[in-house]
Amino acid sequence: MADDSALHKKYPFLNLLHTPPHRPPPLCPQAPRKTQCKRRLGNEHEESNSPLATPCVWPTLDPWTVETTTSSLTITTSTKDGTTVTVQLRL
């Protein structure tokens, strides 16, 4: 059998056989648990007779339009100087 150092010079990957195994990386900290929230459906609010906690009051004389689709809500109004303001919420 040939000398080990000669083998290691000829085949350097043999050195890998004698290296200690790598330690696994430390685990990432877990994310905090998400609190459970009850989703209310739109018709649940209509069935309850209790008023809203904060009444919705819009201090303007100009009317606004509300358009809805299955995935968005668009509210449009005009300011006193004629600027059109559009707010779109995409779900």
UniProtKB/Swiss-Prot annotation:
Q: Which GO terms describe its cellular component?
A: host cell cytoplasm; host cell nucleus
Q: Main localisation, per the record?
A: host cell
Q: A Pfam family for this UniProt protein?
A: Pap_E4
Q: Which InterPro entries match?
A: Papilloma_E4
Q: Where is this region: Disordered?
A: 15-54
Keyword annotations of the record: Early protein, Host cytoplasm, Host G2/M cell cycle arrest by virus, Host nucleus, Host-virus interaction, Modulation of host cell cycle by virus, Phosphoprotein
Q: Where in the cell is it found?
A: Host cytoplasm; Host nucleus
Record bears the keyword Phosphoprotein: yes
Modified how: Phosphorylated by host ERK. The phosphorylation triggers a structural change that enhances keratin binding and protein stability.
Give the GO terms filed under biological process for this record. Answer: symbiont-mediated arrest of host cell cycle during G2/M transition
> Hey, which family's this protein in?
Belongs to the papillomaviridae E4 protein family.
State its role: Associates with keratin intermediate filaments in certain epithelial cells in culture.
Assembly state and interactors? Assembles into oligomeric complexes. Interacts with host CDK1. Interacts with host SRPK1; this interaction may favor expression of late viral transcripts. Interacts with host cytokeratin components KRT8 and KRT18.
Anything else known: The major E4 form is first synthesized as an E1^E4 fusion protein from spliced E1^E4 transcripts, such that the first few amino acids of the E4 protein are derived from the N terminus of E1.
Q: What is the protein name stated in its UniProt record?
A: Protein E4
**Which source organism does the UniProt entry give?**
Human papillomavirus type 6b
The encoding gene: E4
